[in-house]
Amino acid sequence: MRGHLYVGVELYKNGFLDNAKMHMKHPKSELYADIIPTFKAKGSSGFSKELEELALAVEEEKDFNLISLKYKNLTDAITINESFINESSKSLNEKIVLVVSLLEIAAEEYAVGIVNKNVENKFEYQDALGFTVIAKDILTKSGTKNKEEEIKKNKTLVVLDSLFKLWPSLIPTGKVEGDSKIILNAIAEINSI
């Protein structure tokens, strides 16, 4: 979800309002309903209100300062809800499992977005970027318990950083020198660290 939101806000900030609107529809329509039972089970009210407020502000093409505030409110609400996860999910190894799962989604999205270096679906290309940015953000914010974990984290971050060349711009034009196999190879490399 954070991937869709990140890309939507970046597109909005850069003046691509129609593209931003598409990405703001995804989280509510595709993802939020699936996690409502988890919120109920954990005794959380979720973040539907904040998600709606951001989507509405984007739809109404409000000033970017307001969009930025609504985005911050939403990401803060998501962070609060993430605190309901159990302690074992906070370990570096579990964070890396999450990073790999986000990269797997990014690879799927990129494969739909870029086919034989041609832009087939710019929205999926953008989603793949969002998932990759969020994967890096999760790992960057992860703590480590010892030198070995610190080394593992840093090596994984180097692999993640190497992927950003796959997105030369937010709105792809012409040929894109990228392939989803690069993301899949990065996953294999991360798993071997």
Where are these regions (language model features)?
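Mature extracytoplasmic or organellar-lumen-exposed domains after removal of signal/transit peptides
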Residues: M1-I193
